[in-house]
Amino acid sequence: MLRLVRSSRAFHTSLIRAGTQANINPVAGKTADEVDVKIEPIPRHGEETETKRARLLYQSRKRGILETDLLLSRYAKLYLKDMTREELEEYDKLLDEPDWDIFYWATRNDNIKPCPERWAKSPVMEKLRELAENKEREVLRMPDL
């Protein structure tokens, strides 16, 4: 005879469960759709410029979302080697933002995710937006290392 056994756990393992309103975060009192999880970046004090360039190149290529990988890896290939220390810092801060936010800001999808003031006039974002327009109409791929 076959018996159905329901598993129960003493803790909640998932933040999102099919978008139901019953999924309340007991800590914040919000539904799963309203929960903001912000992981602060690791502070990197005294990082050498070449080490920072290598890290930023890696972080530009390995984002996890193909669209953002393509944009940022092309940007890094074109501009990273000539960036000043201040531009590297600004680009580093941009890479701390969520992938989809960067993609929407770069492609000017303000109806989905408006670009915040801190990035709207940024030289880094301006170059990224220019690159995202793909005026040459070329087929994009990950640049070689």
Curated annotation (Swiss-Prot):
- Gene3D superfamilies assigned to the protein according to its UniProt record, in alphabetical order: Flavinator of succinate dehydrogenase
Pfam families (UniProt xref):
Sdh5
The protein's job, in short, is: Plays an essential role in the assembly of succinate dehydrogenase (SDH), an enzyme complex (also referred to as respiratory complex II) that is a component of both the tricarboxylic acid (TCA) cycle and the mitochondrial electron transport chain, and which couples the oxidation of succinate to fumarate with the reduction of ubiquinone (coenzyme Q) to ubiquinol. Required for flavinylation (covalent attachment of FAD) of the flavoprotein subunit of the SDH catalytic dimer.
Which SUPFAM superfamilies does UniProt cross-reference here? YgfY-like (SSF109910)
Protein known as: Succinate dehydrogenase assembly factor 2, mitochondrial
Q: What is its main location?
A: mitochondrion
Q: What are the UniProt keywords, alphabetically?
A: Chaperone, Mitochondrion
An individual GO BP term: mitochondrial respiratory chain complex II assembly
Q: What else is known?
A: This protein may be expected to contain an N-terminal transit peptide but none has been predicted.
GO CC terms for this protein? mitochondrial matrix; mitochondrion
| Subunit structure and binding partners | Interacts with the flavoprotein subunit within the SDH catalytic dimer.
Q: Which organism is it from?
A: Yarrowia lipolytica (strain CLIB 122 / E 150)
Task: Extract the InterPro entries matched here.
Answer: SDH, SDH_sf, SDHAF2
Family recorded in the similarity comment? Belongs to the SDHAF2 family.
Key word Nucleotide-binding present in the record?
A: no
UniProt keyword Mitochondrion present: yes
Q: Where in the cell is it found?
A: Mitochondrion matrix
